Curated annotation (Swiss-Prot):
It is found in: Mitochondrion. Residues 52-71 are annotated as: Disordered. It comes from Candida albicans (strain SC5314 / ATCC MYA-2876). The lineage of its organism: Eukaryota, Fungi, Dikarya, Ascomycota, Saccharomycotina. This is Genetic interactor of prohibitins 3, mitochondrial. SUPFAM superfamilies: P-loop containing nucleoside triphosphate hydrolases. May be involved in the mitochondrial lipid metabolism. Residues 1-19 form a transit peptide. It comes from the Eukaryota.
Length: 629
């Protein structure tokens, strides 16, 4: 049975790649080059130049010990010489690797790639392929190994380490990514539930019609309880309607899954076309999703084998695994994940080139580097280590932190809410009160006003009791203080009536609910680090909870919330605001200054009835008039 299974998988794999090459010659070339690429990030491997991209070491090598390296190299040469003098059967017996794929020794011509950094010379790849054969599995470059194993508590961009500087984490633009993909290859656009709808780049429709793109929302475990089928179906219906009405994407081209929890993986396998290229924003969860598909296939195989190893028990479809089987399964998953599939990391720009992933010998996918429109995206990560990035980008669970029953804090009368020191939300200063639900991993802290923030940041050191409220370290606090009124971007929050979500890209959202009677039209202001982006949107919880229509006061059924998507904005961009040069004048500037900037941005005449000012009455009828998507 074992040999027959191996044979069938081999035949399926060969046929699959054959048909792939017939449809997309460029895809076939990516497959050929996969043998000499880093399995984690996709870059071309080389073992001659440690200071250049793609450098790797075989297990046991140590760069710091040149003598040992020389001896190892000499031993490898002798080992190679011995192997060459053996016939094939003796060679296989010596290396004890009968199932290792036989590699072709011919050189493969390079193809255009996303590697916009120092090119790797052709002769640096001479030994890569043979070494992979001897090692028995794919190799990872030194940069990827260092990120995964050696950068937990230090800044991820270390200028003193050649393989951990910004040039080793390139983040291309959308156009660059698409230039490496065959024009007729299927596209699967992945976006995160953590910051929906910020992960959807409208420019994609300039290159492909919406009917030819498949959209997958991942990280849905932070929005929808896994066991709540009603919530899943309700939100899926909303998402399909949203994508259809906003972008004309067919409803059947939209799917919801979770790579982290391997949720809906079997259905996703059938949803994604064969030989698809998986695209999306950097850090949206593409690689995790692809890896989960790969693991899901092998988990099925392992479960089947575990059940078959019980000859004394009656086999049936209802047979279940025992506790010891699950423990063994967990170990198999951990071991398999560390050696197979694309690498996953919270660091933007981790994937550097196309990574072919064979799921089961039939379906093959291509993990593609993430893109971005934010040129300052990497700036904030200069100040953070791997653990901090993992924490803040993990996302928080909506049902736990964002529901009506969740814990909330109260902000009132001009207080400033610090978002772990990388953002400051200034609330209206007159008779106002808001409930705040934090659906992020940011540590929030209330200050009396901006002057209080300045007084803290002016000190040589942040008080120890407050250090946890600032995500950057103490040595960078003075720089941050100087940036608050200059380097930090100032945004006006568009007027809103009722509850909203303030969404921060890659981070999550903060639910803001006004309480009491509205007594002021003063606008909220957000100071945000330029590496971050934000929008406001209608509360996402409205589209997850029960779809049962409510009764209006006259007894008639209200329209369902999904029916208004084409008529009202679901979200709004924030209004860029000019920052005055004098910090004190900024704090004391009258609300009318923000009113004027809002009207100018929306091209509203100051003398018109619709102009935003203290006299305007905001209510249900005009609450979206000042939103702009």
């Amino acid at each position: 049975m074992f040999s027959r299974s191996i044979l069938l998988r081999s035949v399926r794999k060969s046929l699959g790649r054959y048909y792939s090459s017939q449809a997309h010659p460029q895809t076939y070339i990516y497959n050929l080059l996969s043998d000499t690429k880093c399995r984690s990030c996709g870059i071309q491997l080389q073992d001659k130049f440690p200071d250049k991209p793609g450098y790797y070491r075989l297990p046991g090598q140590n760069d710091s010990n040149t003598d040992k390296k020389a001896k190892t190299s000499e031993l490898n040469k002798k080992y190679e010489k011995i192997l060459q003098n053996l016939d094939i059967s003796d060679r296989n017996l010596l290396i004890n690797n009968f199932s290792a794929p036989k590699q072709d020794d011919e050189k493969v011509a390079s193809v255009p790639s996303l590697q916009q950094i120092t090119p790797v010379e052709a002769d640096t790849r001479d030994t890569t392929k043979d070494q992979q054969t001897h090692s028995g599995h794919s190799l990872s470059c030194k940069r990827c190994n260092d990120v995964i194993y050696n950068s937990k508590t230090r800044s991820i961009y270390d200028p003193n380490r050649d393989n951990l500087n910004k040039s080793e984490f390139p983040i291309p633009k959308l156009q660059q990514v698409l230039s490496t993909i065959p024009v007729d290859a299927p596209l699967v656009y992945v976006f995160s539930a953590n910051d929906f709808p910020m992960g959807i780049n409208k420019d994609i429709f300039q290159y492909r019609p919406p009917q030819q793109i498949y959209f997958v929302m991942t990280k849905s475990d932070i929005l929808i309880p896994k066991t709540n089928v009603a919530f899943y179906n309700n939100f899926k219906k909303f998402l399909q309607n949203y994508m259809f009405k906003k972008f004309n994407v067919p409803r059947e081209n939209v799917f919801i899954a979770s790579g982290k929890d391997r949720w809906k993986m079997t259905d996703l396998y059938h949803f994604i076309p064969n030989y698809s290229y998986i695209i999306g924003d950097t850090n949206c969860g593409k690689s995790t999703l692809v890896k989960s598909l790969l693991i899901n296939h092998h988990v099925k195989h392992w479960k089947y084998e575990a059940l078959q190893q019980r000859p004394d028990e009656k086999q049936s479809s209802s047979a279940s695994l025992k506790n010891k089987d699950f423990k063994k399964l967990d170990r198999l998953i951990d071991s398999f994940s560390s050696k197979n599939g694309p690498g996953t990391s919270h660091i933007p720009g981790f994937t550097r080139d196309v990574v072919p992933v064979d799921i089961d010998g039939i379906k093959e996918l291509f993990d593609v580097p993430g893109f971005t429109t934010n040129e300052n995206l990497q700036d904030i990560f200069d100040k953070l280590n791997h653990k901090q990035i993992a924490r803040i980008t993990k996302g928080a669970n909506t049902s736990k932190y964002g529901s009506l029953k969740s814990k909330f804090d109260t902000v009132k009368n001009g207080q400033v809410l610090s978002l772990n020191g990388v953002g400051y939300l200034q609330f209206p200063g007159q008779d106002s009160m808001y409930q705040i639900r934090n659906v992020t991993k940011f540590a929030l802290h209330k200050f009396k006003n901006l002057e209080k923030v300045d007084s803290i940041l002016q000190r040589n050191e942040i008080p120890k009791s407050m250090s946890s409220h600032f995500i950057v370290n103490r040595q960078q606090q003075q720089q941050q203080r100087n940036e608050l009124r200059g380097y930090y971007k100032r945004y006006i929050i568009p007027p809103f009536y009722g509850t909203i979500d303030l969404v921060i890209k890659d981070i999550g959202y903060i639910n803001i609910k006004p309480t009491g009677k509205k007594l002021t039209n003063e606008l909220m202001v957000l100071y945000l680090h330029p590496s971050l982006e934000a929008i406001i949107r209608q509360p996402i919880l409205n589209y997850i909870d029960s779809p049962t229509p409510k009764k209006s006061p006259d007894g008639t059924n209200r329209k369902t919330i999904t029916s208004d998507i084409s008529k009202t904005p679901f979200y709004s961009r924030l209004i860029p605001s000019t920052v005055l040069s004098d910090p004190s004048s900024l704090v004391l500037s009258p609300p009318s200054s923000d009113y004027n900037q809002l009207n100018q941005y929306l091209q509203i005449d100051e003398s018109s009835e619709s102009a935003y000012n203290d006299l305007l009455e905001l209510d249900e009828t005009n609450k979206y008039d000042y939103w702009i998507e």
